[in-house]
């Protein structure tokens, strides 16, 4: 491929592709670009690309607009064609349905769940309030947040040097 052909190919690429309130890197493959979307990992990205009928090794920015639209639709309707165990929100607390949340909704939903646990004063909610570990990890020796309490060797050496200088001047 000559340098002129390379420039023509580069001009056809969209460097940013907008899917689900997120700008995806158009220079990456479809699978890797979709994995940057919140709530979508490599496995989900592979299923979405196959469902949209897009080659997952193709460059994301090189896709036509209708192909990008089909990928967007496949991401939005992921729970309809994927197994229930692959959804990231199974048996939702409010609706009871399996959902797959993407984008910024992942963080918002997680924060709402934590706040609900705090409000009902569950064990996990109390642990979240106190800033302690929630999932049963040990806390005796790990996860200490305070500053280290130990011997500051430099301060001791400075004090000894001052004491030696003071002792040396008196003799």
From Swiss-Prot:
Residues 128-171 are annotated as: Disordered. One of its GO terms (molecular function) is structural constituent of ribosome. GO terms for biological process: translation. Keywords: Ribonucleoprotein, Ribosomal protein, RNA-binding, rRNA-binding. Residues 160-171 have a biased composition (Acidic residues). GO terms for cellular component: cytosol; small ribosomal subunit. Gene3D superfamilies: 1.10.8.50, 30s ribosomal protein s13, domain 2 (4.10.910.10). It comes from the Archaea. Pfam families: Ribosomal_S13. Located at the top of the head of the 30S subunit, it contacts several helices of the 16S rRNA. In the 70S ribosome it contacts the 23S rRNA (bridge B1a) and protein L5 of the 50S subunit (bridge B1b), connecting the 2 subunits; these bridges are implicated in subunit movement. Part of the 30S ribosomal subunit. Forms a loose heterodimer with protein S19. Forms two bridges to the 50S subunit in the 70S ribosome. PANTHER family: 30S RIBOSOMAL PROTEIN S13/40S RIBOSOMAL PROTEIN S18, SMALL RIBOSOMAL SUBUNIT PROTEIN US13. Belongs to the universal ribosomal protein uS13 family. This is Small ribosomal subunit protein uS13. It comes from Halobacterium salinarum (strain ATCC 700922 / JCM 11081 / NRC-1) (Halobacterium halobium). The lineage of its organism: Archaea, Methanobacteriati, Methanobacteriota, Stenosarchaea group, Halobacteria.
């Amino acid at each position: 491929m000559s340098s002129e052909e390379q420039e023509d190919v580069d001009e056809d690429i969209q460097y940013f592709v907008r899917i689900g309130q997120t700008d995806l890197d158009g220079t990456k493959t479809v699978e890797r670009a979709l994995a940057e979307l919140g709530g979508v990992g490599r496995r989900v990205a592979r299923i979405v690309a196959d469902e949209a009928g897009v080659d997952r090794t193709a460059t994301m920015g090189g896709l036509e607009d209708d192909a990008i639209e089909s990928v967007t639709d496949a991401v939005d309707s992921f729970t309809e064609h994927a197994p229930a165990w692959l959804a990231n929100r199974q048996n939702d607390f409010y609706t009871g349905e399996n959902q797959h949340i993407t984008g910024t909704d992942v963080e918002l939903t997680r924060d709402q769940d934590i706040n609900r646990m705090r409000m009902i004063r569950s064990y996990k909610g109390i642990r979240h309030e106190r800033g302690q570990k929630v999932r049963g990890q040990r806390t005796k020796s790990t996860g200490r947040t305070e500053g280290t309490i130990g011997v500051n060797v430099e301060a001791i050496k400075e004090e000894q040097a001052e004491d030696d200088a003071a002792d040396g001047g008196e003799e």
